[in-house]
């Protein structure tokens, strides 16, 4: 479970190295499959994600929930999705969200003088403003509240969903690029007097299958059109991760930053006509519990502990 892995790593690093209040960068991919990264042998080259593996720690028995909202709820609370009552993706008009009685990760970090940012997908409640991320401990939110979004038009279920701090924001551009650019802006403008918690939830490579044509053209060797687009979406995300890490380097704060990377669940083959390798077949069909990598760029220090984890 996510809570056990985070608590174990936090305890080890804090006990052995004694660093306090590092910056924390959590990056979640959406529906990233086992064979979508080149360090697992994929034809999709992901040098920046691979770099996290080569210089950090990979947990190859790191389990997440089978769908979006449950995994995100567990990550925010350190509690099981069943206990939280979130066992399926939260639909657009559903009167449900991450329980308002739950104290979540950014709220704890704010008490430790962290500036807290969420970019990208929320998917933990949007029926009333009380569920919005800026009411749950995030100082800043830039992204979408629902479970999916058009990469170019930012429309989900017939409604426009691109937000900035509880207000609709009419914005042009590819979703992955918008998230990347805002992350870089936040890093460049970060005040060193406080620590930064930056939670980046990419939409990629979740459907709809959309990517810049120049990236799609890089994968003309792939027979399936859907696979080419999917590969381009992963490529764009990997490139964005590389640029974000470079921004940390330029700001001279990479060595004091914990980087956590994972996927919320595995790939979604019925929509994508994907290579069976993405699913780790023949034993798994469709989305189910997946082994995901937990990676750190700098693993020798951390202060990432949740009081709720201690009590679970």
State what each model feature region is.
Residues 2-9:
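Sec-dependent signal peptide recognition
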Residues 3, 18-304:
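Formylglycine-dependent sulfatase
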Residues 303-312:
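Single conserved hydrophobic/aromatic residue that forms the stacking wall/gate
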């Amino acid at each position: 479970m996510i809570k056990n892995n985070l608590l174990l790593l936090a305890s080890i690093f804090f006990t052995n190295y004694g660093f306090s209040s590092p910056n924390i960068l959590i990056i979640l991919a959406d529906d990233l499959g086992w064979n979508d990264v080149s360090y697992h042998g994929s034809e999709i080259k992901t040098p920046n994600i691979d770099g996290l593996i080569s210089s950090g720690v990979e947990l190859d028995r790191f389990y997440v929930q089978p769908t979006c909202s449950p995994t995100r709820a567990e990550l925010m609370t350190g509690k099981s999705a069943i206990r939280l009552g979130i066992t399926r993706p939260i639909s657009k008009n559903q009167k449900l969200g991450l329980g308002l009685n739950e104290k979540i990760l950014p709220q704890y970090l704010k008490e430790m003088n962290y500036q807290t940012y969420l970019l990208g997908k929320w998917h933990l409640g949007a029926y009333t403003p009380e569920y919005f991320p800026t009411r749950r401990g995030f100082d800043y939110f830039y992204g979408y509240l629902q479970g999916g979004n058009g990469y170019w038009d930012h429309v989900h279920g017939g409604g426009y969903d691109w937000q900035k701090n509880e207000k609709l924001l009419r914005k042009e551009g590819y979703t992955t690029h918008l998230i990347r650019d805002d992350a870089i802006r936040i890093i460049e403008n970060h005040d060193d007097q406080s620590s930064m918690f930056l939670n980046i939830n990419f939409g990629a490579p979740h459907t709809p299958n959309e990517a810049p044509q120049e990236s799609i053209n890089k994968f003309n060797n792939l027979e399936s059109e859907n696979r080419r687009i999917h590969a381009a979406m992963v490529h764009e995300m990997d490139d964005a991760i590389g640029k974000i890490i470079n921004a940390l380097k330029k700001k001279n704060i990479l060595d004091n930053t914990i980087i956590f990377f994972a996927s919320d669940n595995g790939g979604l083959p019925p929509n994508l006509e994907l290579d069976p390798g993405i699913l780790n077949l023949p034993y798994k069909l469709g989305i189910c519990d997946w082994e995901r990598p937990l990676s750190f760029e700098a693993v020798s220090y951390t202060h990432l502990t949740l009081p709720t984890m201690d009590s679970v």
